[in-house]
Amino acid sequence: MIRIRFGMDVLLVLLLATCLLTPAHGTPLEWDFAVTLRTKIQFMDSSWQTIATAAHEFDELSALTFDESEELIYFNDLKHRNGSIFSLKRDLIAANHVAEQTIARTGNESVGGLAYDPLNMNLFWSDTEQRKIFFAPIHGSATPQVLVDLSAEGGRPDGVAVDVCRRKLYWTNSNVTHPTVERINLDGSNRTVIISSNIDMPRGIVVDQLSDRLFWIDDLKGVFFSVESSKLDGSDRQVVLKDKHHEPLNLAVTNDAIYWTDRTTRAVWSHPKVPVIKVTTTSKPDEEDSTDSTDFKDPEPVAEDCPLVRVANLSEEARGIVARTGFYQRLQKDHHCASIVRKVKERVDEQSRKFEIRSLLDQKIKVLEDERCMNDGEYRAATDLCICPTGFKGSRCEIRECHNYCVHGTCQMSELAYPKCYCQPGFKGERCELSVCSGLCLNGGHCRVSKDENEAPSCECPAKFGGARCEQNSTEICSLFCRLLKHEPEMYVPFGCHSICEELAQDNSTNIAIPQYQHLEVCLTPRVWTSSVIIILVVGIVSSLLLVAVIVQGIRRLYKPKRPRIRKTFVVRKQARTNSAGDTPLTNRPLATEQCEITIENCCNMNICETPCFDPKLVEQTLSKSSCKEDKKILIHNMEDDLY
């Protein structure tokens, strides 16, 4: 019986060892990003490949937050009848997830944003319907309390974020009439508006503890949106990105990028954030090469990545998003966060001590658990996780962060637990991937780098080339002086040009490609009479002549004298006239009592539209046989007949 029991104990130990030492694929343990869709939570790795999904029993998920100290995710379901906020943890035995109710539903809540304080273990959330911000402890059944009430002032709280190190809560007020970004102490005191101008409708917000900055999304008017950043007090405001045709809700920040969910495209997008942690690329004195200089070849050019990247396509509408930040490793030496991290770690360690060793089997399991975490990682039985020391990562702390990180340099971990490269002489860049000689020397010049890091690299130029970058062709320059020497033999010639002039004279070649040198065109005599200049000159002369001709013709017509108008005056006297038998009232008109004067213009001054001064038919009949005196008589006689 003892042997059978001992065999069963050994078998059980082996089974447990297999479970502990085998990576739990398909579980949320290895994830780097978590995104809430409408009906599930999707876990993804660093390359945005889906590794697991959870919370399928819910219908309307929205916001979520992450407790990295205990590996718990808190999320909200808008349609659940009993609960409002739930927690998601990993089952150690079944290797899957378990969702539990954390905050009971008290009414028609509409959670807009979630945040968690790992020190006091409190949840904070915004209610867009009641226009208030609540908080409640995750353990126990305490009634949620109001931290901020915006209903009286017409505000609408949306995104919330906790500054764990400085003990403050930040939120966005998406009221379109008076949008703001505000903060308050976690105890409810010292409420402050930090952003109130040049903002339309702020949505999600996050506190980046690594850079001590705020990042938030602003849904601008029309189809535009922006991602903005500032210091924790609202100063040093920067626009990280401005684009259009997105409907972003929430965002997450890592060391080098910003990620946000977009409801329009059903995707997760990323954009580089401004690097705050400067990577040192200087050379360490004890690692310098003993030689005075080193030869380098130009590396291959590095292509730039698109700043706006669609990292994940989702099957449903994307809403909340969280990312791992390495809370323990990154902030252990931060002067604002070191004390908070220490207190949180002490609390987690106290919970781990509750798993006491009671038998030999437990001792064997304990040994296997300790062996699960590599590189002195600390095993957490409550969460089945390894807390890795600085410089290591992975589910078992098996990955060294400096491994293959620096291309031409030595890697060390910085005070903020990030890899930092000390570059070899002649290299630069965040990972020492760029050569200082890249593109420096021209025309086949050879780059030389001194061991003194303060001394700039130099170029060794081939024959007949000079300059700091071998950009000057000495043959082309000296050829100009050679031409001048033919006319002024006593002029000054730079050193070395005499021998080149002799070579050119022996070569008897005049086809020197002087215009090919980019700086010599200023020394050449410019060609004035080019074809374009001649064409413009001819066109200008012809146009000037035509203009002068038009002006002269206009002046002549303006000052040309008019033709004289010839006027003749005839005095007609009254004559005795007897009435004939054939006179009628129409033919026998009354005559003037005295006399009248008739002015007759010369017909040569009349045009065709004027009334002629005599009957043309009568003139035709008498033209051949009448003299000038008879014409006048006929004309006067007809005029007398026309008078009334």
UniProtKB/Swiss-Prot annotation:
Example of a GO cellular component annotation carried by this entry: plasma membrane
Result of knocking out the encoding gene: Accumulation of spermatocytes with cytoplasmic abnormalities. Early spermatocytes are filled with small, refractile cytoplasmic inclusions, late spermatocytes often contain up to three hook-shaped structures in the cytoplasm. Testes are short with incomplete coiling. The sheath of pigment cells that covers the muscle layer surrounding the testis frequently peels away, particularly from the region near the tip. Female fertility is also reduced, ovaries are small and misshapen.
Entry keyword annotation includes Signal: yes
Position of the signal peptide: 1-26
Region described as Disordered: spans on this chain: 280-299
Paired cysteines (S-S): 402-411, 406-421, 437-447, 441-459, 461-470
Compartment(s) of residence: Cell membrane
Membrane topology: Single-pass type I membrane protein
Residue spans of the LDL-receptor class B repeats: 121-166, 167-211, 212-257
SUPFAM superfamilies (UniProt xref): EGF/Laminin, YWTD domain
Keywords noted in UniProt: Cell membrane, Differentiation, Disulfide bond, EGF-like domain, Glycoprotein, Membrane, Oogenesis, Repeat, Signal, Spermatogenesis, Transmembrane, Transmembrane helix
Segments traversing the membrane: 532-552
EGF-like domain ranges (all copies): 398-430, 433-471
Extracellular side of membrane: 27-531
UniProt function note: Has a role in spermatogenesis and oogenesis. Might have a role in triglyceride homeostasis. Probably by regulating lipid storage and catabolism, plays a role in neuronal function.
Stated family: Belongs to the cueball family.
Designated name of the protein: Protein cueball
Organism: Drosophila melanogaster (Fruit fly)
Taxonomy of the source species: Eukaryota, Metazoa, Ecdysozoa, Arthropoda, Hexapoda
